[in-house]
UniProtKB/Swiss-Prot annotation:
NCBIfam families: dhys, PRK03971.1
Record-given protein name: Probable deoxyhypusine synthase
Enzyme Commission no: 2.5.1.46
Gene name per UniProt: dys
Top-level division of the source organism's lineage: Archaea
Species per Swiss-Prot/TrEMBL record: Halobacterium salinarum (strain ATCC 700922 / JCM 11081 / NRC-1)
Function noted in UniProt: Catalyzes the NAD-dependent oxidative cleavage of spermidine and the subsequent transfer of the butylamine moiety of spermidine to the epsilon-amino group of a specific lysine residue of the eIF-5A precursor protein to form the intermediate deoxyhypusine residue.
GO process annotations (BP): spermidine metabolic process
Pathway listed: Protein modification; eIF5A hypusination
GO molecular function annotation: deoxyhypusine synthase activity
Record's keyword annotation contains Transferase: yes
Recorded family membership: Belongs to the deoxyhypusine synthase family.
Amino acid sequence: MTGDDADETHENVVPGSDEDLDTPDVRGYDFSGEFDFFELLDSYATTGFQASHLADAVDITREMREDDATIYLTLTSNIVSSGLREVVAHLVRENYVDVIITTSGSLTEDIIKTAKPFKMGEWDVDEAALREEGINRLGNIFVPSDRYVWLEEYLYDFFEEFFADQKVRTPTAFARELGATLDDEDSILKNAADNDIPVFCPALTDAEIGNFLYYYRQGYDSEVGIEILDDYDALIEEGLLADTTGLICVGAGVPKHHAIMTNLFRGGADYAVYISTGMEGDGSLSGAPPEEAVSWGKIKDEDAEPNYALIEAEATLVFPLLVAGAFENP
């Protein structure tokens, strides 16, 4: 190989560039000085990868608040299964969010935890043995079956009062009136009821609440029912009456889609933050990034600056950091 040939191959291996990128240097947090938690969070902006996405999400959530946006918080039931329940309850107690959209499992587990705790368990266990012992597994969280025995009794008493004057009620009325019966400062439903924050639950039957409603209808009163269209109207109105809307979607599924779909009626949400481990490649709603919602008109696309962010991470790791950075940073 001649010297000229070597020069050509070198150019392939180490291509030259005269460009000076006008972007920040990649740099992480300096632990050598006095530790500052919020400076650590700020350093995520130049850390790269998902840390920088988290920093973007913090900035966008701060903008929601500065813009006095109507903030929607959507969450799946596993969020309430975990210790994130207390994080969500804090947001609701402090009136940091205006609308909650969630699943029936979230309501179920919030109610149970007002009386009986969930317990830390393990991922790798003998499932058949757990079944024999009356223990249900949610990842590495254990839920003894006696929790559901207690829940059934509690709900039957509630059903009698709830359906006494009206046979057909909405999920938001269900959540509000049920929350008013609870006595636990860490309850999402109690704090929502106290602060008049609506809790929308479009799939109210998709958990033990649905099971117990079935048995109540079979054994006590076949005329009771749940009306979801009135709630859908009300959810659309939340967006239409708002000057600005912002979405914080923790997980996906029905809650996330109800938030973005009802914002379509107003021309799209102004801000959106997603936390998700969903995979875009399967074409599912759960894996769809904010950009896909832009194509449907469910989220606005602001050319001037980013108005949405996706953190591809498991929520128990990053949601508390988002809350700290966006709501608690002085």
